[in-house]
Regions:
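Hydrophobic faces of well-ordered beta-strands that scaffold small-molecule active sites
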Residues: 16-19, 39-41, 67-71, 90-92, ...
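N-terminal amphipathic alpha-helix/helix-capping segment at the start of soluble metabolic enzymes
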Residues: 1-17, 128-137, 192, 247-251
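Alpha-helix-loop-beta-strand connector modules within alpha/beta enzyme cores
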Residues: 50-84, 106-114, 134-137, 182-205, ...
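C-terminal alpha-helical cap/extension of soluble enzyme domains
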Residues: 116-127, 139, 145-152, 184-251
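Glycine/Thr-rich beta-alpha phosphate-binding loop at enzyme active sites
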Residues: 168-185
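Conserved anion-binding
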Residues: 77, 83, 87-161, 165, ...
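Short, acidic/polar
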Residues: 20-33, 73-81, 148-160, 206-210
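Conserved N-terminal beta1-alpha1 strand-loop-helix module at the mouth
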Residues: 1-67, 71-74, 141, 162
Length: 251
């Protein structure tokens, strides 16, 4: 199995993904070699094109971090393009119906499980000449719960063959429910999703801030620009006596 994220989850280990939302190969490479298990490539809330993302994934071939793409929607075109350019994870936003997540699994999977067609792409150069035979075993589907409607179908969603992770989108769940984290009704929804997902043997995901929550193993870390800002602030906080002796060297 070349999807190391899936392998780690099968072993009961937590995984963390850094978020990419700008089409810069250098940023992608820095994140891909920073220790993240995967990269959450954000195509729902960014203007990035599949061509730009394909170039980043190719630049990062061989990096430890596995490419996951949050597609704009669970359409055949979006899922097909994402898998053809080498994503091993399809993150499906706003799953409010079982039909939506089933469609994602169908389009991400080759027959007999799905209806993904053969086409040109860089997947073979990235993941091996036997990709057609191994893709279904390695590609993951992550369904996102972002609303009370998603909460209600969490167990049924997790039970769909081909769904690996049910992810609680903390901010959107708050927005759509008009409840705040920490409030009893909000926490009850989170617990319902967690318990329902674990009951059918699937993985529960959430934001990195929830890394200490019981039962969660799949986490989304902040985007690269946020991490860059935090890193710069931490570096400057260490400065006590002016610039380094050699300009640009570590202090």
């Amino acid at each position: 199995m070349y999807n190391t994220v899936k392998q780690k989850l099968l072993e009961g280990k937590p995984v963390i993904g850094g978020t990419i939302q700008t089409p810069d190969p250098q940023i992608y490479l820095a994140m891909a070699h920073s220790g993240f298990d995967f990269l959450w490539i954000e195509m729902q809330h960014s203007p990035m094109t599949y061509q730009e993302v394909a170039l980043m994934i190719w630049a990062g071939r061989g990096a430890p971090a596995i490419p996951f793409i949050r597609v704009p929607d669970a359409t055949e075109g979006d899922v097909q393009k994402a898998t053809d350019i080498g994503a091993l994870g399809i993150i499906v936003p706003m799953v409010n119906t079982i039909a939506k997540v089933k469609a994602a699994v169908k389009y991400a999977s080759y027959p007999p499980r799905g209806s993904r067609s053969l086409g040109g792409g860089q997947y073979g150069a990235l993941w091996g000449s036997d990709y057609r035979q191994t893709a279904n075993e390695n590609i993951m589907v992550v369904g996102m719960v972002e609303s009370p409607e998603g909460v209600e179908i969490a167990e049924e969603m997790a039970a769909v063959e081909g769904v690996d992770v049910v992810f609680v989108a903390s901010s959107d769940l708050s927005s759509f429910s008009e409840l705040k984290q920490g409030e009893a009704k909000y926490e009850a929804m989170v617990s319902k999703v967690r318990d329902a997902t674990l009951a059918v043997g699937r993985t529960v995901g959430g934001p990195f801030a929830w890394k200490e929550r019981e039962g969660f193993h799949f986490f989304q870390a902040p985007p690269a620009e946020v991490l860059a800002r935090r890193g710069a602030m931490a570096l400057l906080a260490e400065v006590t006596d002016g610039i380094a002796e050699t300009e640009g060297s570590e202090r």
